[in-house]
């Protein structure tokens, strides 16, 4: 191992990018910096009422440069010379259209303010109808079922649905695009100067989980399948968009001269392959086979790795994909998740905080006091509910405020609140929100357990896991399993740094690198036997309400007029 080697991990989240410098020999986190996306902060290019969420590529470029330069300037001159690799993770599926030169269309002047020419963020649900069409065609029997390895349901959050939707609604983008690229693949290509479609190295993680790529059918779905969806997928775009994929421990190139100068780093820095944030977060958390890693933030992503012999040729139903090498090369990566977790709490906070915002506008002299109350609202609600949970009067809340990802994706579903009375107050209702997110977490655990993929350990990471012990204890009690909290606040970036260390040759493989670099555990929560018993009937009630409510969100049948 190169003595003193340092790698950088870049974690592109929904709101900001984080840069982390890690000492490869010890896993010590040297420096970190977050940089927000300015256009996103201003709410530009997003229409929440329509479930439209877009990121401008310039936001990624500007934020990345600020964050990395800040970290690099904190390193000593020798440490800067010791940087041997950069790893990248991102949200996903977050794809964007590119031209023949590999430019994201929004970086061209004529598309600079066109949301359809930007990255379509993972939680954008404008492509529901297109996703349903893909699922229906997969189940039609006319073609092999390309959805079999992604849980049997194609989601509006994923690659092909978003391509179809944008192509249907925007002729200019459709005509200018020759391919589409995931954010986690684009950033390594940008840094290494390999953005042209023919030079792009597509990551196994994104391709297998979101693009219907699988070695069984030698890559992407056949042209006849895509033509049946819409001929534009093979006529307007290159076919195939790609064929080969790479695991994230393999290098895609080295830092280009331009980016070496912009970041203040040597040109021989290796750029490793990209993957989704939660998959790399699982590696940063030190995940082993049959450990369920819950990356908890605005939503959750639940990751497990399993040996190929146990999975064999089975298809795991209801999840978001099973992909060889998507997490750890040589193991099957399994993905699940909840479409909203922290976002639900944030929605409730905005709802209750509306009068405070209005009062601050009407009384500017008191605006700081009103803002303080608003900022501490969720913390105060959590404390109040924990002091007096009153589980016998817990409202029913279904955690579908942003649809359902797992089990069995359905983005038509909406949040549901029931079983209220005149005695229900704000803390009690917020307690219902906490319980709902824990119940959703349990359905994912049971989805794996019931398909002979036993959950042997549960790890939780992310801001909520580290800062909300009440919420984590409820999850622990509802799932009736020990729940370990990972110490690092930057597990996703840490995982990216681990992959960079392997790509740069510091370690031979990911498990070897994890032994030195992965995060330790902060604590392990144990289920409270009394609360386990009290939550059990409430969980069953949640499942009953799910069965009752889901059919109500099905699309209305088309009416047939009689003349």
Curated annotation (Swiss-Prot):
The keyword Repeat does not apply. Its EC number is 2.7.1.16. The gene is araB. Keywords: Arabinose catabolism, ATP-binding, Carbohydrate metabolism, Kinase, Nucleotide-binding, Transferase. It is an enzyme of class 2 (transferase). One of its GO terms (cellular component) is cytoplasm. GO terms for biological process: L-arabinose catabolic process to xylulose 5-phosphate. CDD domains: ASKHA_NBD_FGGY_L-RBK. It comes from Erwinia tasmaniensis (strain DSM 17950 / CFBP 7177 / CIP 109463 / NCPPB 4357 / Et1/99). Gene3D superfamilies: 1.20.58.2240, 3.30.420.40. This is Ribulokinase. It catalyses: D-ribulose + ATP = D-ribulose 5-phosphate + ADP + H(+); L-ribulose + ATP = L-ribulose 5-phosphate + ADP + H(+). Pathway: Carbohydrate degradation; L-arabinose degradation via L-ribulose; D-xylulose 5-phosphate from L-arabinose (bacterial route): step 2/3. InterPro entries: ATPase_NBD, FGGY_C, Ribulokinase. GO terms for molecular function: ATP binding; D-ribulokinase activity; ribulokinase activity. Belongs to the ribulokinase family. NCBIfam families: L-ribulokinase, PRK04123.1.
